[in-house]
Amino acid sequence: MELDFGPAVRDFRDELRDWLAAHLVGEFAEHRGVGGPTDGAAWEVRLAWDCELSAGRWLGVGWPQEYGGRGLGLLEEIVFEYEYARANAPYRATVNALDLLGPMLLQMGSEAQKKRFLPPILAVGELWGQGFSEPGAGSDLASVRTRAEREGEEWVVSGQKVWTSFGVHADWLYVLTRTDPQSVRHKGLTLLLLPTDQPGVEIRPIRNLAGQDEFAEVFLSDARTGADMVVGEVGQGWRTAMATLGIERGTTLLPQQLTFEREAESLIDLARERGALDDPMLRRRIVDAWISVRIMRTTNLRTLAELTTGRTPGAQATTAKLYASTRHQQLGYLAMELAGPAGQIVGENYGLDTRQRSFLLSLAETIYGGSSEIQRNIIGEQFLGLPKEPRP
Amino acid sequence: MDLTFSEEQDELRKVVRSFLAKHSDEAEVRRLAADERGHDPVVWRRMAGQLGLQGLAVPEEYGGSGFGYVDLGIVFEEAGRALLCGPYFATVALAAEALLRCDDEAARTDLLPGITSGETVATLALTEESGRWDEQGIRLTARETADGWQLTGAKTYVPDGHLADLLLVAARTPSGISLFAVAAADAPGLTRTPLPTLDQTRKQTRLEFAGTPARLLGAEGTAWPGLARTLATASVLLAAEQVGGASAALDAAVEYAKLREQYGRPIGSFQGIKHKCADMLMEIESARSAAYGGLWALDAGDEREIAVAAALAQTFCSEAFTRVAGDNIQVHGGIGFTWEHPAHLYLKRAKSCEVLLGTPSYHRELLATRLGI
Ligand SMILES: Cc1cc2nc3c(=O)[nH]c(=O)nc-3n(C[C@H](O)[C@H](O)[C@H](O)COP(=O)(O)OP(=O)(O)OC[C@H]3O[C@@H](n4cnc5c(N)ncnc54)[C@H](O)[C@@H]3O)c2cc1C
């Protein structure tokens, strides 16, 4: 796939291409395509790669210069993500802070918070984890129970968070807490920034189905953070949290979809090797897999075109995640079927090849970031205007 | 990157939608569906005269407006939404395209202005008993005589062949596939038999030629590449029509799901229905990407990309429209199963679109071949 984003960004693109050609070498080049939004593979190499990117000032391309970014526009951000994915560079270890927390702080944070937290993110000096989900609050995030109480100039936080991606690496967490004990649901919640290096915070890895200690559970017992660590207003945490989840600028889908395209191409190669293309049923599913990735591409391009021309993204932006996650899973199932018995054999210590890992991890894509069922509720209620289910 | 619509294109959509709301509402669709000719010449002339829809993407030198395929796709999408009856697809997506793609400047100059002005209804006669849309399916023969070329044989499933003033006929000659023009009125040896159709909003005809005189377009035996390209363009335009039809079916389902109550609450509050509607939207938006991707490819003009995008669009949009139209009936329950309710009109249109230019399986195979799979 070759896309030209126009003359305005050509110099920028060329600079980036040259830089990638010079720096994506050696160990970094060996880890092309490694990692993913919930894939902790080769963590140390990826972290080193993030430092390399940081030294080249390629992190925070769209962030203001005063916080260490380049202060460029959405188009440059898109070009960056596209060229980055095209070069198949390792998946950034710091992506959580770059894609979620950073934009949230830029939008809702105080000046002091921006000054304090944004530069270290771009310098890969501090890593972040998202502490939203709890054992009792998953899809129904508004039922969080982790409590935070004000004590002098501090907040004291107790409760349990779970499924925190890359939690074991986190220096800081952004946590959704209940600050008004009398409150129910969306009211009385507050978003707090909390350092992990303290006695009240215990983080235990959870092994995921691919055998990786990727996400974590977080136990908070009288954990402390400063009074100035509230993002947005006290009691308005739901709004702040939703703003984070609403930060979908279309830039994240593009690299994901290029990865899917690569997988589809490799699927076709595999099918050819196995002689599977002569089987009409398999052949049909293979073509359909290819169709899906091509449709994802056009859908993303439609959204990007709308964003860059200042239009409101259309309905496709609300259905893109549901489509991509379900179709990517189908692609994984098909790839595993084509791989046959050899695909059933893993390496030492449950070492997985790219295909096996991608297949297993694709099972999470319909769960995190709003499960497929929740996506359908949102599409139905917020986009199509269908009535909500009555609450019991 | 220009994968979005301009303000002018939004305006075009608005104008066409309000025109069709007036001239192709449900009552009119039902009237034309029940009518053997299925065509309103007054509306046809207005489409040309007021809006220039027949010549929208035809270059100005042939009396058109020289707009792009994205613009034309907008019209087809709206036509699909309104279940427009009549020979618009046959004339514009098939016949005008075939003329633009054949290597015969004189024919273009002679024949296209009639189409763009709304005087001529035209169609492409390609399929025969086998229903095949490929080169091998063309058996009808043309023979050169002292008085010029003559056609002998039969074409069938010809869209709007009963009305067409101008028939473009694909035929086999000693050196291959050639394209011919027949002025249908009083053509000697031509018999036209309208075929009763499952989808009454799109008429089909059987055409029999017995030594019918015809005008050869372009050089003998060289027509197939232009025809293949015509079918690619028509595939994309049909995909746009399918997206429009599917959108209308979803709108109907959603509207009903908000109104109809069972167990004391609107059925749209049940996840079984709500999630079905969400899946319909996802299907439609994906189909939209498939169709729009094809339209953008047509305007960009890269032939390989056009061939791929067209086959993809037909495969995906055919299946999407059929599924959504079926789900719309399901959401409506018993009322959706009646002749009175319009839901079946969309299902039947979906089924006729699905085979109009070859089935999804056929297009999937075309796509595979074009991708080298
Ligand atoms: C790999 C991975 C990484 C994650 N990373 C993070 C992270 O960094 N930080 C964080 O805070 N969280 C994270 N999560 C958590 C994620 O947000 C939750 O798993 C998700 O919100 C679903 O919640 P749950 O697991 O409690 O499932 P539940 O909400 O209990 O859902 C179980 C099933 O019930 C369905 N269901 C629930 N409610 C409804 C409804 N109203 N209608 C229909 N069906 C319904 C769901 O769709 C699902 O199929 C991660 C999850 C995964 C898998």
What spans do the regions from the language model cover?
Chain B
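Short beta-strand-to-turn element immediately C-terminal to the catalytic PLP-Schiff-base lysine
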Residues: 100-103, 169-172, 181-184, 208-210, ...
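Flexible, small-/acidic-enriched active-site or ligand-binding loops
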Residues: 137-139, 157-158, 184-216
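N-terminal glycine-rich flavin-associated loop
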Residues: 86-106
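Cytochrome P450 C-terminal beta-domain/meander region
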Residues: 134-152
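A short, Trp-centered hydrophobic/proline-enriched beta-strand micro-motif
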Residues: 118-129
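Short glycine/proline-enriched turns and hinge-like loops at secondary-structure junctions
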Residues: 67-68, 134-136, 160-164
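Alpha-helical interface subdomain recognition
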Residues: 1-83, 102-106, 114, 118, ...
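A short core secondary-structure module
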Residues: 125, 152-191
